[in-house]
């Protein structure tokens, strides 16, 4: 899929990663805690499977139904890991502060 040192930006769509019980009307996830949980799981999976997580940001564009989505920047690196500057809570808080208006 990606050679060592290769980089990619992946879109995290919480509405598809959260359990059904955590998804609201029209498939929208509004709970910040659910967003944090989904992102933590994805970042943990990536870092344990040969990817280094370089950055995390929220998408400035909401999904068609109003979902907040996130972008994670990763590099193929057998040692894995997460950059110390990646702050899931801060990114989720900023996303909700900016996009939940």
Model segments located where?
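Rossmann-fold NAD(P) dinucleotide-binding segment
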Residues: 1-3
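Conserved beta-strand signature within the Rossmann-like core of class I S-adenosyl-L-methionine
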Residues: 5-12
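Conserved nucleotide-binding/hydrolysis micro-motifs of P-loop NTPases
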Residues: 14-18, 61-62, 77-79
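Short, glycine-/aromatic-enriched active-site segment of Class I SAM-dependent methyltransferases
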Residues: 14-31
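Short alpha-helix
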Residues: 35-49
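Conserved S-adenosyl-L-methionine
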Residues: 50-60
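Conserved catalytic loop of SAM-dependent methyltransferase domains
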Residues: 58-69
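Flexible, glycine-/basic-rich loop-and-beta segments that form/coincide
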Residues: 68-101
């Amino acid at each position: 899929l990606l050679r060592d040192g290769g980089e990619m930006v992946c879109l995290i769509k919480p509405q598809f990663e959260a359990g059904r019980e955590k998804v609201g009307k029209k498939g929208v996830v509004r709970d910040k805690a659910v967003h944090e949980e989904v992102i933590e799981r994805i970042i943990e999976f990536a870092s344990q499977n040969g990817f280094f997580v370089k950055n995390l940001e929220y998408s400035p564009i909401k999904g068609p139904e109003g979902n907040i989505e996130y972008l994670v920047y990763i590099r193929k690196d057998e040692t894995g890991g997460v950059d110390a500057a990646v702050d899931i809570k801060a990114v989720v808080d900023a996303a909700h502060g900016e996009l939940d208006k």
